[in-house]
From Swiss-Prot:
Summary of the function given for this chain in its UniProt record: Required for maturation of 30S ribosomal subunits.
Major subcellular site: cytoplasm
High-level lineage: Bacteria, Pseudomonadati, Pseudomonadota, Betaproteobacteria, Burkholderiales
Source organism of the structure: Bordetella petrii (strain ATCC BAA-461 / DSM 12804 / CCUG 43448)
Name of encoding gene: rimP
Protein name per the record: Ribosome maturation factor RimP
Family named by the database record: Belongs to the RimP family.
Membrane-spanning segments: none
GO cellular component, one term: cytosol
Length: 163
């Protein structure tokens, strides 16, 4: 069987959606997560579901149920391109190795300073502006290789007040 992620990505080429993840879950569930500039609508999920159902049938991909959805507000970030795309946003990262006895940091992501031609030769160094202690803002510099997992971490205001 071909690489399921690559097959799915190829099937979605030209559909104006970005493949975020493909996951096999219990009881034959195949979960596909997509994203799109401006947000994913139900029509996008329906269109992707129809397309993938046909492709998976032709490619003999074994599944009982296909679920297509958006990554939600706490979208995972797995590539340098995704980190660059969400520069300026609040994210949470978990480091592979602890720094000052701590692995999890939340703050505002800044784009790498070494963007450009040199970025191909060396991994991009991103910055995360976080509050170490009350009113003590620090910047953590990291590469994608330092990160075990990263995700968007928006501050949601359910009271309806503007900040």
């Amino acid at each position: 069987m071909a690489d399921l992620y690559a097959l799915t990505q190829q099937a979605l080429a030209g559909m104006d959606v970005e493949l975020v993840d493909v996951e096999r879950a219990a009881l034959g569930l195949l979960r596909v997560t997509i994203d799109k500039a401006g947000g994913v609508r139900i029509e996008d999920c329906e269109q992707v579901s129809r397309q993938l159902s046909r492709v998976y049938e032709v490619e003999n991909i074994d599944y009982k149920r296909l679920e297509v959805g958006s990554p939600g507000v706490d979208r995972p970030l797995r590539t340098e391109a995704e980190l660059r795309r969400f520069a300026g946003e609040r994210i949470e990262i978990k480091l592979r190795q602890p720094l000052d006895g701590r692995k999890v940091f939340s703050g505002i992501l800044s784009a790498p300073a070494n963007d450009g031609a040199a970025a191909d030769a060396q991994p991009a160094v991103f910055g995360l502006e976080f509050e170490a202690k009350k009113d003590d803002i620090q910047v953590l510099n990291f590469t994608l290789g330092d990160v075990e997992r990263a995700k968007l971490d928006p501050v949601l205001d359910f009271k309806g007040k503007k900040r």
